[in-house]
Regions:
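Short sequence/structural segments immediately N-terminal
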Residues: 2-412
């Protein structure tokens, strides 16, 4: 064999080896990093196709804890009982995943979620009992009295279906009843395919819904010292830390999840964000929750990971004073409105007269904001976004009420 033939054979062999190497590197990581044949069959085949049509799905999955633990696509997309089945390139899957798919591995977390206001009460705040079974309503009422057994909100009829579907539902569907008998969708907080605790711990995740004039928690958080320090030091936090071993070394600055859900330094994990709340701050007149003492003790235990008992007690005492003062203002406005109805001055449907909107804004916007600001360290929201506009609307209500009475010949 001539030198030229040997050289040509070596070049061809090298080219083939290089091509094989480059082709292998181009394959999705999930095909090359997972060891079992079943995993390659399920996830590898899915990734091979979806990498061409929906690369972001494959990329997000590659970064997930599910991928690291060897959980394949089929294990999540396997139809749960009661779900619609679809034949998809040789696999029987469900494309409309719900909490029913997640509960197969995370049933304890799902049960905690069911007890929360994120579950059925979130949906019922818009649509009442629509779509919920009697058993689901009864279960929810056990833990959240009055949260589910209620009529649809007046805005459903007044604003129409499109406003609900593209507006309110985008947040309140976290508690939507599913055809498979489950409630909710875990991806509202954890996102699809990434299924990330990092994303769930970010304030911006909660801010998808907890923002705006009627529930301005993210705006209050960003003004607070907690929010300011988070913005400065977020890059130093271990947002990927395993939930069961989370400590203040990982999260030395709290996010929403740290205070309301995380287990930290031995404090128990919960997927019921109301478990540590001692008041119904969203209500017009705020009352203590049935588990007031236990809930407050749990939240104070979280606070104590960074703060002294004296400071914690002082903050709670001051916040409770704001709650009582806000209740007094709202109750005065309620009495005014009830008096108008009793005297036949105000007998039209809800939200049909300007005074209805002024009263609603007083408690639903300003009252809530004042109370949340007091508990979350947002001074400006207690005053200029809370008490000041409440005072302004109180004067406006009295003026409007007097004019209505004059028009009806029932002036006082």
């Amino acid at each position: 064999m001539s030198f030229r033939s040997v050289f040509l054979a070596l070049v061809i062999a090298f080219a083939l080896i290089l091509a094989a190497f480059l082709l292998n590197r181009a394959r999705p990581k999930i095909e090359t990093e997972q060891p079992t044949a079943d995993l390659v069959r399920a996830s590898g085949k899915c990734a091979e196709c979806h990498a061409r049509t929906q690369y972001s799905v494959v990329h997000e999955y590659e970064m997930s804890a599910h991928a690291r633990k060897g959980i394949n696509c089929l294990e999540c997309h396997q139809p749960a009982p009661g779900q619609e089945k679809k034949d998809h390139h040789g696999f029987v899957i469900s494309t409309k995943l719900t909490a029913g798919n997640c509960r197969g591995c995370h049933d304890g977390i799902y049960q905690q979620f069911l007890r929360s206001r994120h579950a059925a009460p979130a949906w019922a705040a818009i649509y009442g009992e629509k779509g919920l079974s009697p058993e689901q309503v009864n279960f929810s009422e056990t833990y959240q009295p009055g949260g589910t057994r209620r009529p649809p909100h007046p805005f459903v009829q007044l604003e129409g279906g499109s406003a609900m579907t593209s507006g309110c539902e985008k947040c309140h569907s976290v508690g939507k009843p599913n055809p498979d008998g489950t409630i909710g969708n875990c991806t509202d907080c954890h996102t699809r395919h990434t299924s990330s605790v990092r994303i769930a711990r970010l304030p911006s995740t909660c801010a998808q819904c907890h923002m705006g004039p009627d529930h301005s928690q993210i705006e209050i958080y960003e003004e607070s010292k907690h929010g300011i320090i988070f913005q400065a030091q977020a890059h130093l936090l271990n947002l990927d830390a395993p939930p069961k071993t989370l400590t203040t070394r990982d999260m030395f600055v709290p996010t929403c999840a740290t205070c309301h859900m995380s287990g930290i330094n031995g404090v128990g994990i919960t997927h019921d964000p109301s478990e540590r709340l001692s008041y119904y701050l969203a209500n017009a007149i705020t009352e203590k929750r049935p588990n007031y003492a236990a809930a407050q003790a749990k939240m104070k235990q979280v606070c104590s990971q960074c703060h002294t008992p004296a400071l914690i007690d002082r903050v709670y005492s001051q916040a409770e004073q704001v709650v009582q003062a806000t209740n007094d203002r709202v109750r005065s406005a309620q009495d005014l409105m009830n008096g108008l109805r009793k005297d036949g001055v105000l007998n039209s449907p809800p939200f049909s007269q300007p005074i209805d909107f002024v009263y609603f804004d007083l408690w639903h916007y300003d009252g809530r904001t004042s109370k949340h600001g007091a508990f979350m360290g947002g001074a400006d929201f207690v005053q200029w976004h809370g008490n000041y506009p409440m005072l302004q609307k109180t004067v406006e209500l009295r003026s409007m009420a007097a004019e209505l009475r004059r028009q009806h010949g029932k002036a006082k």
